[in-house]
Swiss-Prot record:
Active-site residues, Swiss-Prot/TrEMBL: 40
GO biological process, one term: proteolysis involved in protein catabolic process
Coiled coil: none
Name under which the protein is recorded: Proteasome subunit beta type-7-B
Gene that encodes the chain: PBB2
Keywords, in A-Z order: Cytoplasm, Hydrolase, Nucleus, Protease, Proteasome, Threonine protease, Zymogen
PANTHER family in alphabetical order: METALLOPROTEASE TLDD, PROTEASOME SUBUNIT BETA TYPE-7
Regions that span the bilayer: none
Locations listed in the record: Cytoplasm; Nucleus
GO MF annotations, alphabetized: threonine-type endopeptidase activity
Catalytic activity: Cleavage of peptide bonds with very broad specificity
Length: 274
């Protein structure tokens, strides 16, 4: 071991060098990029045979609708799915990472994944980043211990509830659940209630919109109902599209030449000496 490596004092687990750099750049006039507001409505509930998850399909970039039919219900394991709200890249990256870890665990043990295992992996990862990973999740699944539903916040805190909502449209969706949820719901009653909660978020929140996706998870079976409901169908003025007059439209009557005629005269003479 070299003497230089021994003389270096040990550092802590977190470095604030980049924070100081960003503060210095801001003082010199650099405008830091602003955060874009995100919008989503994701929900979940437990019914008598399993778990039902639901989500809208609108993705936004501030005031712009970036995608009208994106998927917000992510695969975690054959018996576990997860709805994501927040930054789309963060939710997809986090769920894909944990999904791969669950698959390796199944290969190692030969057993089905448990919902609490996925919950622990997600909350530990999000807590380590102190909320800078913008992923708010609703995790649901059915394992050997029964149906489970959890919410995971970007800072790593979790809740275990019989019904849950997250996202910018969560208050509107929660009002539907609190008014109509009851224990022992059937599959059809649960799907209807989840769809109504998502529609409430779609119609009362500008960040939510487009269609309704639903995922039903029971013991040994899952059913992904893509575009189960389309409360805002895309309509046109004419079913045949736009039509134009069948003739040439006169745009200009005055013609302006681009260049005037220029005469070029060739001058005879001796070449210049170098």
């Amino acid at each position: 071991m070299s003497q230089s490596s021994v003389d270096i004092p040990p550092k802590g687990g977190f470095s604030f060098d980049l924070c100081k750099r960003n503060d210095m750049l801001t003082q010199k006039g650099l405008k830091a990029p602003s955060f874009l507001k995100t919008g989503t409505t994701i929900v979940g509930l437990i019914f008598k045979d399993g778990v039902i998850l639901g989500a809208d399909t609108r993705a936004t970039e501030g005031p712009i609708v970036a995608d009208k039919n994106c998927e917000k219900i992510h695969y975690m394991a054959p018996n576990i799915y997860c709805c994501g709200a927040g930054t789309a890249a963060d939710t997809e990256a986090v769920t894909d990472m944990v999904s791969s870890q669950l698959r390796l665990h199944r290969y190692q043990t030969g057993r089905d994944s448990r919902v609490v295992t996925a919950l622990t992996l997600l909350k530990k990862h999000l807590f380590s980043y102190q909320g800078h990973v913008s992923a708010a999740l609703v995790l649901g699944g059915v394992d050997i211990t029964g149906p489970h539903l959890h919410t995971i916040y970007p800072h790593g805190s979790t809740d275990t509830l019989p019904f849950a909502t997250m996202g910018s449209g969560s208050l509107a969706a929660m009002s539907v659940f609190e008014a109509k949820y009851k224990e022992g719901l059937t599959r059809d009653e649960g799907i209807k209630l989840v769809a109504e909660a998502i529609c409430s978020g779609i119609f009362n929140d500008l960040g939510s919109g487009s269609n309704v996706d639903i995922c039903v998870i029971t013991k040994g079976h899952k059913e992904y109902l893509r575009n189960y409901m389309e409360p805002n169908p895309r309509t046109y003025v004419s079913s045949k599209g736009y039509s134009f007059t069948k003739k040439t439209e006169v745009l200009l009557t005055k013609i302006t030449p681009l260049l005037e005629r220029v005469e070029i005269v060739e001058v005879a003479g001796e070449a210049m000496e170098e």
